[in-house]
Amino acid sequence: MNANELTIAEARDALARGELSAVDLTMACLTAIDAGTPLNAFVHTTPEIALDQARAADARRGAGAGALNGIPLGIKDLFCTRGVASQAASNILRGFKPEYESTVTSKLFEAGAVMLGKLNMDEFAMGSSNETSCYGDAVNPWKVDDRRLTPGGSSGGSAAAVAADLCLAATGTDTGGSIRQPAAFTGIVGIKPTYGRVSRWGIVAFASSLDQAGPMTKSVRDAAILLGAMAGHDPKDSTSADIPVPDFEAALTGDIRGRKIGIPREYRMEGMPAEIEALWARGREMLADAGAEIVDISLPHTKYALPAYYVIAPAEASSNLARYDGVRYGHRARLGQGDGIVDMYEKTRAEGFGKEVQRRVMIGTYVLSAGFYDAYYNRARKVRALIKRDFDEAFAAGVDAILTPATPSSAFGLGEMADADPVAMYLNDVFTVTVNLAGLPGISVPVGLDAKGLPLGLQLIGRPWDEAGLLNHAHVLERAAGFVEKPRKWW
């Protein structure tokens, strides 16, 4: 096994035993990144920074070293990294190098992590296939019949990099499923924490009431380790919760006897593929065999979640993206003689924003306009409150976690949805958006392969602030599924 193929936990132990140096581990990842160019997962590599951090980690080894000392990670391009290009995969931020560090990356560096570079993503995190990036498509390391497949979105580069062993783990963000869907498509683990568990400061905003950062890893244990380093109160983020961060790794006891797992009847969608239904049934059996009690529950407002999400998220995006005007930073259009400031705004945004971002900004502006605010935006906010109430009632009735599919299918081909109705692409989020609307933690765990040999995942949804319990349930599911498959290397 090459060093870049290790999990965080395995690498941590090997580093502690002196069997491996952080420099060797980092070099193995940098070599893998060079070989992995066809995946287009990394869009900016930082070998000098990485090796400096690795040497510092080797010097620190021993007492007082952080939980991630010497562990090489990839960072989604949505996170601001001081002095390193941070473009949110958008032409409008081309060349932007922040003069500050996001809270998440600061915490990772404090824990001793090594930054290998920045990862591809959908532009401004708007997409489910990583096809809206100014850097071009990220490619799933899993392949069928020589077709290039999507790694999912928006954290597609993060998912592809982890699945292909280009890095030991990566950061992602999740607004409506952007950690969990790519994780399911690539056979890795991805957790969206409770809203407010991880600081959003220094992360380019999409929809501020929905965005949440989280880890994308090779195992549930790694997710627990990485989340422990990312989480915590941040006075710079007013939505960051001032509550203690438990030891997530210590919570992985593997004992879920007597725990109650809810199965929401509303997630049995019309036309659900038989493979997804069978996978869900298998997940129920695995948790029951581990001693959990399986109960049917109702989340009656689930059917309204997708339309509510695609009103609220674009509305918030249209407000957040108004700051990109060509005045202070990023791209500015070339102006003709006689052009005024309005012309500059219009030309800059037309050149800088891609089609999907423009579409969502227009939707958001429309639903916030005077004649439609009550009909669309206010109604969507009321639906959101009802969706949250459904979950609150299920948890109040004693349910400890909820099991659902993570995605309605396995990964599809790049370009296959290009001419489809945008709503068809939005349906990829059908199982995940409720979690963001309710502010809950959710995790995708790889459980099996479909008939084509592509990975499929199941989603577990937890009580608010109970990532520890959620991770333990996921740990049990992971062990029972025994998913160890890796993509056959073609790149």
From Swiss-Prot:
The record's InterPro entries line, in alphabetical order, gives: Amidase, Amidase_CS, Amidase_dom, AS_sf, GatA
Q: Which Pfam families match?
A: Amidase (PF01425)
Enzyme Commission numbers on file: 6.3.5.7
- Name the catalysed reactions: L-glutamyl-tRNA(Gln) + L-glutamine + ATP + H2O = L-glutaminyl-tRNA(Gln) + L-glutamate + ADP + phosphate + H(+)
Q: So where's the catalytic machinery, residue-wise?
A: 76 (charge relay system), 154 (charge relay system), 178 (acyl-ester intermediate)
One GO term describing the cellular component: glutamyl-tRNA(Gln) amidotransferase complex
Q: Name one GO molecular function term.
A: ATP binding
Q: Which GO terms describe its biological process?
A: translation
Q: Which family does it belong to?
A: Belongs to the amidase family. GatA subfamily.
Give the quaternary structure: Heterotrimer of A, B and C subunits.
Listed name of the protein: Glutamyl-tRNA(Gln) amidotransferase subunit A
- Organism, by scientific name, is Cereibacter sphaeroides (strain ATCC 17029 / ATH 2.4.9) (Rhodobacter sphaeroides)
